[in-house]
Structure formats: structure tokens, C-alpha cells
């Protein structure tokens, strides 16, 4: 019992033989750095150059440019009139430079002029444009249209004057409405998903293929993406619409006046208003 008490109550000190402080994670981190550096050096040394698929052995396959300086170019005073570096990168959208569509500034001017004429706010104008686009799909964009155009509010017809729409459209209303071409095409396609829908432009031309209804409005923009069959149908409808049209460069001149003074004097004895008396002879 005395021996057990001695072990229980006495204190003992433990001494390490080495003076180094041992850290369980320290040596691993130190050892990892040289290993990582050696791995990176091995990767950098072992990295090969990318294989050029255009080469075969030591021979290089030449690449040619689509536009080279060797071709004949317009020159002014011996200097080329074109910037080939810019031309190689210049690929604008067709609709942005097409003269069948009003420019963006012309459309902005028309939009603001119509809004001011109708005296409506910026938040209400898009709703009015929805109605105008659908109305133009049905009735066309002829410059000779007048009166009012109609938008439906439920079962109620709301009338708007056409005068500000046509008068402010520069160059033409059709070129202004060309900005709505893609949306109008999608709208017709949406209507056809619910029920058969053919715009009036296609009904008048007796277009029998309902799949071409999306192209049956007169402000549709023909682009490079337009299918050949749809392009042919649209051009045929346009030709039929313009066949009966007879545009006149000059109308009847309202400033008509006599070129010379008429000095003829007639009496009741004259044979006719344009012929003098025949000395007793009468006009048979």
C-alpha cells in the first residue's frame, strides 16, 4: 500500500533526448515545397510544342488571304483608296445598311413625332405600336391610306388618326414599318399555333399555302436567311399587288391659263362660235 501511495502522490518529470521542437504538420509542408518545385520543373521541361496540323515534316502549307494587296484596287494619286485590314473585318448586318429600311435616326424621329401628335406617354406608346403593327399586317402600308386606323380594346374599337403616322414617315411608311418585320413574322406564327390565320395581304393574292402566311405582309424584309420558296411567293404577291397600280409622275396641272389673248369677235349671225358668217350660208 505504501508503494502505491508513493506512485500516486509523487510527481515525475519526463525529458526528451533531443532539443528539437517537433511539429506534426511542419515538416510535411517544408518537404512538400521542394517536391512541388521539382514537379513543376519536370512539367516545364517535358512540355512539348503544339502540333501544327498544317505541317507535314519540315514543309509548311501556305495560307492565302481572301483579299490581298496584289489585286487591282481603286487608287487616288497612286495610293490605294481602300483599307484592306478594315475591309477584312467589316461585315455589317444587311438590314442595317439596306435602303429598304429607314435609318435608326429616321425611325426615332417618326416615333417621337407620332407620340407627340397622339399626346401619350412613353409607357403607353409601345401598346399603341402593337396595335399599329397588327393593323398594318392586315391593311398594308400604302402611302395612299387615309382616315383612321383601329385598335381593339376587348370588344371596343379605339380609333387613331392616320395623318401623323403617314405624314411623319420618312422616307416612306413601308420603310418605317420594316423595323417591325421580324416581330410581325413571329406574331403571325404565334397566331397560327392557335388557329389558322392568313393576313389579308395573302388572302387577296389567293395564297393557298398556310405555311407561307408568315411572309404574307407587304413590309416583310427579304434577307439572305429567307427560304427560296418563301422569297418567290413574297415577290409574286408584290408583283400582283403592283400590276394594277399606275403611278403618275405628274398630275393634272391646276395652274392652267391661256397662252395668248383671243381677239376674235363673233355675232349671232355667225355660223358657229368658232366660224364667222358665210354671207347667208347656213350650217347644215
UniProtKB/Swiss-Prot annotation:
Its EC number is 2.7.7.48. GO terms for cellular component: viral capsid. It comes from the Viruses. It catalyses: RNA(n) + a ribonucleoside 5'-triphosphate = RNA(n+1) + diphosphate. Disulfide bonds: none annotated. GO terms for molecular function: RNA-directed RNA polymerase activity. The keyword Nucleotidyltransferase applies. InterPro entries: Poty_coat (IPR001592). Residues 35-44 have a biased composition (Polar residues). Keywords: Capsid protein, Nucleotidyltransferase, RNA-directed RNA polymerase, Transferase, Virion. Genome polyprotein of potyviruses undergoes post-translational proteolytic processing by the main proteinase NIa-pro resulting in the production of at least ten individual proteins. The P1 proteinase and the HC-pro cleave only their respective C-termini autocatalytically. 6K1 is essential for proper proteolytic separation of P3 from CI. The record marks 17-18 as: Cleavage. Residues 16-57, 255-284 are annotated as: Disordered. Belongs to the potyviridae genome polyprotein family. This is Genome polyprotein.
